Amino acid sequence: MAESFTTTNRYFDNKHYPRGFSRHGDFTIKEAQLLERHGHAFNDLDLGKREPVTEEEKLFVAVCRGEREPVTDAERVWSKYMTRIKRPKRFHTLSGGKPQVEGAEDYTEADD
């Protein structure tokens, strides 16, 4: 991976991970460092803005297109990142579900 995925800028995703990859808890320290170091190259290869140069980059693009399963650390961490940012956000409410209406109990009248 020495000549593969070269980039000069560190990668940060302020929209999905405003406190950074390592502080969010989705990624291990190693995965967060890999994303920060090579994230721009991963993103450019995934979007087609950059042509793959090495064999490793060509295999990475195949993983991004869904043609093969992720094998290397770079492929696994990018797949994990993409799944995390594409999943719908879960939110929790404080209400108990359906709204309660007063006086809507079930009454049955019995003839005595």
Curated annotation (Swiss-Prot):
<comment type="function">
    <text>Involved in the organization of the Ori region of the chromosome into a macrodomain (MD). It constrains DNA mobility in the Ori macrodomain and limits long-distance DNA interactions with other chromosomal regions.</text>
</comment>
<comment type="similarity">
    <text>Belongs to the MaoP family.</text>
</comment>
<dbReference type="InterPro" id="IPR007335">
    <property type="entry name" value="DUF413"/>
</dbReference>
<feature type="compositionally biased region" description="Acidic residues">
    <location>
        <begin position="103"/>
        <end position="112"/>
    </location>
</feature>
<protein>
    <recommendedName>
        <fullName>Macrodomain Ori protein</fullName>
    </recommendedName>
</protein>
<dbReference type="Pfam" id="PF04219">
    <property type="entry name" value="DUF413"/>
</dbReference>
<feature type="region of interest" description="Disordered">
    <location>
        <begin position="91"/>
        <end position="112"/>
    </location>
</feature>
